[in-house]
Each structure stands twice: as structure tokens, then as C-alpha cells.
């Protein structure tokens, strides 16, 4: 409560009696109390206000007006002229002029800004200081004359700033006046000291907040546990399916999320698809655990070994694995009675799951026998092995330079580094990994890779480079075939076929490049995870998913890779292996997009625009993704991606020429056929191109071959375009152009004994001579001839650039 006092500055309170106006503001700020206290003159301090007569105006106003009709006294001690003791504080006796009750509540703003003194009125507008209680809101009638009480009956005064009838609760505050009690009632029931209670709106305490947060955490954990239980039930219901069969279901869920457009799909639908994808990934992991692990009390298996085998299975089925922590939780879900121990020699120990055994998978793709992974604790006489049980959440302390106590022979690792079979040697305690392809040697595997994969730096120059004899196979034939409705799928965001059945084939980490004491589980896990990473990049770029490319390019940010794996990944011995994997990834993309050249019916302006916008952002995204990598590895990656972007830009230019030619060719194909028959003379052109003095030169030979190609295949192209197509989905113009492009690439493959640059030079000169004759004699169909000339020229240059890219040369 705040009390303000208002008086005139010229008045002297010690020479005369003047009214002092007090404004009392309730803490609720919803009502204002107004009082007039009459202070006595000096010398009248011994007179008690209650003993004065009805006509005594000594404490009244100076004009002699009577205010005794509304004057009541407060129970206050006598005021003495002597100074009070220091230990006591007394208030002077005062008479309270309680105004009559108003019918309306007053405004604080108007009371504070009144310019003139408040007129005395018999109708007060503010509530009295003391009412009949907080529950009484109706005013009581004001008595006409309060009875005077003898001084002997007065009780010792107890002054209270907040009378008991006034409540500080905001919810109980009101602008309406409270009913008051008569003085008789007050004297018979003297007021007691008001107890100050805080009834303001309560603020939640920190304890309540902690309880709420704890409840939220418990709810979140319960929700996660419920999801794991549901996933376990689904896995148990699908135990009859093989790993490969359920991998198709998981891939279907991943495709559904990948095919959704965030701009055209609702947030709820996108979240539902992502939740379904995560649940299917959990079910796949649980199903893999049920088929490859079993509970056995006297066996144990390294914790990293289980993840290595699981990641290898994901790599074989082209799936993204769960993190090691998530897989550990699922292991506890399937096998709740497991214990964790750190076993092994000092300096070479690591965490093991005790009571778990890896078994042979039914499909044989991921298998471990009892002798190489799950060893009996009964025969373990090592006094150091029984160590204290660590926390399940503790990371596995695996160091690249420290070998596992049961290290495997790296020379016999399979292509994925995971399949393990029973060794045929005499010592069963020394397991040996066996390749899925026993007849395929390491040299044969490396020879099957592109030339640049064997020699990333490249040994051939552009002048020495020749076209291969199987150019169509190298450039256009891709195992991941371009579907007939690829254009529709990309633009309509539908599901994409063949994504579940195709994945790139990558080399394993070569034997001998790493120290012999490197943990085999770490090597196997790193191989599988980087293979999955490269396949993920391939899928995102293949389906032009610019939103997902940024996340796919960050290999180090994956939850599955541990610090030990990352340190091994950035080590110098693995730079060449990483370069080979990257080159295979982007070579596969080039071969996939090159299929547009021989499938011209799938080319559209929308596809070209999306491909062009994605390629513009790709270099910047790569630069952000390689910030944490060493300089040598960054240079290799940037070199590959820069050549890839340049090559795709040249492909886009070629596709634009093909698209423009197909738009104009149906109109001018009849005129072009007449020009070819009546204007073009190939013998005259050959005579101008060859050098008669050197009939055995390469230039003359190439020119003669070009003349023979034009006589046969250009004539075939123009004649076939005039026929009727049997396939209504493909126009006759597209079909004719596709056939001529294939024929031209086959012709180039036959010229493998000539250098690429020499062949390009001769072809350009011969074509320009043909266009020159047509432009001089007839220009009606010149536009379409120019488009065809550019298509053939850009096609030859593009094939040359692809040969440079796969051979590791700068594009």
C-alpha cells in the first residue's frame, strides 16, 4: 500500500490546524482510498479526539464548519509533547474523515490529475478503510452519530497498516466499496495485527519445473521403448522372410521419403513417411540380430564385430545402417540378459558382449562361426580378461594401431570385408576370411575398374588418348538402365524403379597399405560405411534431389562412424582407395546421365533445368563437406568433382542441341532429304579434304572413313525419318536420331588406332564442308542442318571428354 500526502506549500502545520489529504492506493490497483487527517496545533496534543464535544471544532477546518457527523477516531495512543522513547514509535492522534460511499468506482487517473482541491461532499466515492470482511461487497448504512466511548474503556491500540478486512489478493480486489463496521463493533472486537499473506499469482518453483522435465524425459523414454517394442513385434512376425526380402521393404520406405517434394508435400505426411522409414530400419536391424545372433551364456563377441557385420549387410543391400548406439539398444531389446565386459590383453582390450554368440546366417551373406567370433569363457585362462563391467553407453575404445585380440587376416577379406566362413586350415583358432568370389583375385578386381582407378594420377596425355573399341559400353551402357518414364517420375515425384536392385560396386581397402595391427573390425566397418555413403551420393544426384545432396556429402557427420573410423579414413594410406571410390561414383553418374543422348524421347526442358541448377550448387556443397578432411584428400576430391561438373555442363549443352533439333526437324525433314539428294556431293568434298601427295596419311584415311559413314548412315537417318513409327510413345524423329547416334559412336569405336584429337579435327572439317555447300545453294532448311551439325560435333567432343574423365585426365 502506498500513501501520498497533498498539502499547500504555504501552510504551516505547527501554527494552525489544516486538512492534510492522503491518497491511499491499494496493492490491487483497482481502488483508491481518500482520507482527510486533521493534525492538531501545538498545545492541543493532550486533548483526546474522542472526548471533545459535538461543537468543538478545534481540530476542524478554520472556517468553523462541522464535520463531526462523519468523524470517527482511530484507536491510537495519546500523543505527548515529550519525545517518545527511542524503542517505541507512536503515531499522532488523528481524526479520520470518512467520505460517504459513492455509487461508482473512482478512477486513479482522474484523482492523480485533478487541478482543483477536492470539494467536500456528503457522498464519498471511495470505500472505507475498514469493512465488514472480504466477502462483503454491499455497503452498510452510515450511522448518523457514532456513540462516544469513555477513555477508560479503550483497549490498547494495535495499529495495522493492512486491516484484516482488506485483502491483497488480486482476484478478490474490487472497485466496489467494502462495508464498514461501527465503532462499537470495533471496540468490542478490537482489530488484530493483520497477517501478511502472499496471495498473488504463484510462480512455479524450481522443484516443480524439475519434476515436469523429469516427467517429460520419462515420457520420451517410454515412447522410445514403445517404438522398439513395436519394431520387435514386427520383426518377430517377419522372421520367415530373408534379409534380402525385407531389405526391399526398407528400401521402399527410403524411396518414399526420397521421392517426396518438401515444397509440395505437407509436413505431417513427410513426418509420417520419415517415421515409417526409421521404424523399418529398426525392424531390419532386429531381424538381422535375430537371424545372426543367439544367446549363449558361455560365449562372448566383440561389440565392434557385431556392428561391422551389420554394416556389411546394409552395404550389400544398399541400405543406410543405424548408428552404433542405436544398434546397441536394439541388441539389449532382443537379448536383455547380456552383460558387457572389457576383455583382452593390456593395451589391446576392448568391450565384448558376454552371453552372445554370432551364428551362421541362412543366406550365407554374413556369417561367423563359433571358433572365430564367439569364444568360450570356460577355456579362457587369461587372468586379465575378467574386468569390471563398463557402462553400456561408453564408447568402444578401438585404436587404429592396436589390433584386436582375435584379429583376422586382412589378405583374405572379401570385397565387402564382412563374409566369414570356416577356415580350412589346420588351426581353427586362426580364422580366415574368404571372398564371395573365390576365383576372382585382387588383381582381376582392380583390372575391372576404370583405368583411372588403377592410376588416379593418369599417365596418358590428351594427344595420346584414343577412343576405345567399346565406346558405347564405356559411355552409354549403364547397369542402372534409364527407365522409359524417368522424365515423368522426376517431375511428378513418384517412386523410382530399379533403385532397389542397383548399387555401385566398389573396391575393398587393399591389403598391405595399413599396419598389420590395425583392427579388422574397424577396417570392415569403414569399408561398408563408405560404400553406403557413395551409393547415397549416387542416388541423390541421380534423382536430382538438391535438398538431400548436402547431407549425403557429409561423411564425417554420420552417426554411424566413430572417431576411430574417421581417423583411419583420413589417414594417408587410404587416400588412393577413397579416390577410387569417388571416381567410380561420379563415373557411374556420368554413364547414367549419358543415356539421355540415346534416349532423346526422355529429354525435356524441365529435366535440363533441374540438372543445370543442381550442378551449379554442387561445387559449393562439396567445399563445405570437405572442410574437416586433410589437404591431400581434399585436393583429390575437388579435382574429381570439378571435372564431373564440367562434363555435366557439356552434356547439358549437347542435350539442348538435341532438343532444339527435334523441335525443328519434323518441319524441315522433307526439305533436308531433298537437299541431301540434290545438293550434297560427298565425292567433291572428299577431294577437297584429302592431300593427293600423301595418300597414306592418317588424315586421308579418316576422311575416307567419314565419307563412307555419311553415304550410309546419314542417308539411312533421313529416309527412316520419313517412315511411320511403330511405337506411339516414341516419335519417328526421336527413334531415327537415336539410331544414328548409336551408329556414329560405333563408327568412332572403329577408329581406335587414331588419336582422339586427330579424329575430332578431321570430322569437324568434313562436316563444315557439307554445311558450307548447303548454305550456298539452299538456306530454307539451314537452321535444322546447323542443329544437326552441332549435335554430331558436340557428341564427338563429349565422348572425348568422357574418355579423359575415366582415365583421370583434366576435363
Curated annotation (Swiss-Prot):
Chain segments carrying region Disordered: 48-92, 111-156, 181-222, 377-461
Keyword DNA-binding among UniProt keywords: yes
Q: Which GO terms describe its cellular component?
A: cytoplasm; nucleus
Highest rank taxon of the organism: Eukaryota
Q: Which Pfam families match?
A: BCD_RFX, RFX_DNA_binding
Write the record's keywords in alphabetical order, separated by commas: DNA-binding, Phosphoprotein
Keyword ATP-binding part of the UniProt annotation: no
Pro residues bias: where?
140-149
In which residue ranges is the amino acid composition biased (Polar residues)?
A: 185-204, 409-428
The record, for InterPro entries, names: DNA-bd_RFX, RFX-like, WH-like_DNA-bd_sf, WH_DNA-bd_sf
Q: Give the free-text miscellaneous remark of the entry.
A: Present with 377 molecules/cell in log phase SD medium.
Protein name per the record: RFX-like DNA-binding protein RFX1
**Which organism does this sequence originate in?**
Saccharomyces cerevisiae (strain ATCC 204508 / S288c) (Baker's yeast)
Amino acid at each position: 500500500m502506498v500513501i501520498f500526502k497533498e498539502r499547500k506549500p504555504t501552510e504551516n502545520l505547527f501554527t494552525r490546524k489544516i486538512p492534510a489529504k492522503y491518497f491511499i492506493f491499494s496493492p490491487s490497483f483497482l481502488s483508491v482510498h481518500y482520507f482527510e487527517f486533521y493534525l492538531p496545533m501545538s498545545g492541543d496534543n493532550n486533548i483526546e479526539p474522542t472526548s471533545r464535544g459535538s461543537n468543538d471544532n478545534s481540530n476542524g477546518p478554520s472556517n468553523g464548519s462541522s464535520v463531526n457527523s462523519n468523524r470517527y477516531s482511530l484507536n491510537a495512543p495519546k500523543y505527548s509533547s515529550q519525545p517518545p522513547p527511542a524503542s517505541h514509535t507512536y503515531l499522532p492522534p488523528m481524526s479520520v474523515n470518512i467520505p460517504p460511499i459513492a455509487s461508482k468506482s473512482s478512477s486513479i487517473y482522474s484523482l492523480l490529475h485533478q487541478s482543483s482541491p477536492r470539494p467536500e461532499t456528503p457522498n464519498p466515492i471511495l470505500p472505507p478503510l475498514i469493512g465488514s470482511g472480504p466477502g462483503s461487497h454491499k455497503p452498510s448504512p452510515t450511522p448518523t452519530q457514532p456513540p462516544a466511548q469513555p477513555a477508560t474503556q479503550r483497549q490498547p491500540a494495535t495499529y495495522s497498516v493492512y486491516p484484516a478486512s482488506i485483502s491483497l489478493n488480486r482476484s478478490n480486489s474490487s472497485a466496489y466499496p467494502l462495508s464498514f463496521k461501527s465503532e462499537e463493533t470495533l471496540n468490542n472486537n478490537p482489530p488484530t495485527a493483520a497477517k501478511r499473506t502472499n496471495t498473488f499469482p504463484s510462480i512455479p518453483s524450481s522443484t516443480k519445473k524439475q519434476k515436469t522435465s523429469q516427467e517429460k524425459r520419462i515420457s520420451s523414454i517410454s515412447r522410445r521403448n514403445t517404438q522398439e517394442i513395436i519394431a520387435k513385434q514386427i520383426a518377430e512376425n517377419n522372421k520367415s522372410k530373408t534379409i534380402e526380402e525385407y531389405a526391399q521393404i526398407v528400401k521402399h520406405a527410403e524411396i518414399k521419403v526420397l521421392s517426396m517434394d518438401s515444397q509440395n508435400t505437407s509436413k505431417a505426411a513427410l513426418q509420417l513417411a520419415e517415421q515409417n522409414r526409421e521404424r523399418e530400419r529398426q525392424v531390419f536391424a532386429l531381424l538381422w540380430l535375430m537371424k545372426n545372433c543367439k544367446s549363449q551364456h558361455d560365449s562372448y563377441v566383440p561389440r565392434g564385430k557385431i556392428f561391422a557385420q551389420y554394416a556389411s549387410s546394409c552395404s550389400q543391400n544398399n541400405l543406410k545402417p543405424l548408428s552404433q548406439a542405436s544398434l546397441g539398444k536394439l541388441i539389449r531389446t532382443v537379448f536383455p540378459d547380456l552383460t558387457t565386459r572389457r576383455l583382452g590383453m593390456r593395451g589391446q582390450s576392448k568391450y565384448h558382449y558376454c552371453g552372445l554368440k554370432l551364428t551362421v546366417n541362412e543366406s550365407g551373406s554374413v556369417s561367423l562361426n563359433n571358433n572365430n567370433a564367439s569364444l568360450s569363457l570356460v577355456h579362457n585362462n587369461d587372468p586379465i580378461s575378467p574386468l569390471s563391467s563398463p557402462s553400456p553407453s561408453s564408447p568402444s575404445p578401438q585404436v587404429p594401431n592396436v589390433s584386436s585380440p582375435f584379429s583376422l587376416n586382412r589378405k583374405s577379406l572379401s570385397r565387402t570385408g564382412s563374409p566369414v566362413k570356416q577356415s580350412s586350415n589346420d588351426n581353427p583358432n586362426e580364422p580366415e576370411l574368404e571372398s564371395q568370389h573365390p576365383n576372382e583375385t585382387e588383381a582381376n578386381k582392380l583390372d575391372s575398374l576404370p583405368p583411372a582407378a588403377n592410376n588416379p594420377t593418369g599417365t596418358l596425355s590428351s594427344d595420346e588418348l584414343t577412343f576405345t573399341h567399346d565406346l558405347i559400353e564405356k559411355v552409354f551402357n549403364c547397369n542402372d538402365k534409364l527407365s522409359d518414364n524417368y522424365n515423368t517420375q522426376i517431375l511428378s515425384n513418384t517412386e523410382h524403379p530399379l533403385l532397389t536392385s542397383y548399387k555401385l560396386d566398389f573396391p575393398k581397402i587393399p591389403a598391405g597399405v595399413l599396419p598389420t595391427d590395425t583392427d579388422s573390425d574397424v577396417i570392415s566397418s569403414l569399408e561398408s560405411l563408405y560404400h553406403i555413403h557413395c551409393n547415397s551420393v549416387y542416388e541423390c544426384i541421380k534423382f536430382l534431389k538438391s535438398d538431400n545432396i548436402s547431407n549425403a556429402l557429409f561423411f564425417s557427420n554420420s552417426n554411424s562412424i566413430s572417431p576411430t573410423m574417421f581417423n583411419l579414413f583420413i589417414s594417408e594410406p587410404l587416400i588412393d582407395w577413397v579416390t577410387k571410390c569417388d571416381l567410380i561414383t561420379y563415373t557411374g553418374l556420368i554413364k547414367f546421365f549419358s543415356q539421355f543422348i540415346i534416349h532423346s524421347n526422355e529429354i525435356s526442358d524441365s529435366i535440363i533445368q533441374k540438372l543445370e541448377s543442381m550442378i551449379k550448387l554442387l561445387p559449393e556443397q562439396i567445399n563445405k563437406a570437405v572442410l574437416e578432411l586433410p589437404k591431400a584428400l581434399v585436393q583429390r576430391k575437388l579435382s574429381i568433382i570439378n571435372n564431373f561438373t564440367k562434363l555435366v555442363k557439356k552434356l547439358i549443352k549437347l542435350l539442348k542441341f538435341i532438343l532444339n533439333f527435334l523441335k525443328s526437324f519434323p518441319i524441315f525433314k522433307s526439305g533436308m532429304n531433298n537437299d541431301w539428294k540434290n545438293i550434297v556431293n560427298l565425292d567433291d568434298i572428299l577431294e577437297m579434304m584429302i592431300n593427293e601427295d600423301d595418300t597414306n596419311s592418317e588424315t586421308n584415311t579418316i576422311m575416307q572413313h567419314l565419307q563412307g559413314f555419311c553415304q550410309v548412315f546419314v542417308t539411312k537417318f533421313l529416309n527412316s525419318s520419313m517412315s511411320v513409327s511403330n511405337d506411339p510413345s516414341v516419335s519417328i524423329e526421336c527413334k531415327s536420331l537415336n539410331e544414328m547416334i548409336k551408329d556414329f559412336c560405333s563408327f568412332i569405336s572403329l577408329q581406335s588406332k587414331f588419336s582422339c584429337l586427330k579424329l575430332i579435327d578431321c570430322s569437324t572439317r568434313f562436316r563444315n564442308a557439307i554445311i558450307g555447300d548447303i548454305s550456298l545453294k539452299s538456306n530454307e532448311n539451314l537452321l535444322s542442318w546447323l542443329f544437326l551439325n552441332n549435335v554430331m560435333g558436340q557428341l564427338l567432343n563429349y565422348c572425348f571428354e568422357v574418355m579423359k574423365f575415366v582415365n583421370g585426365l583434366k576435363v
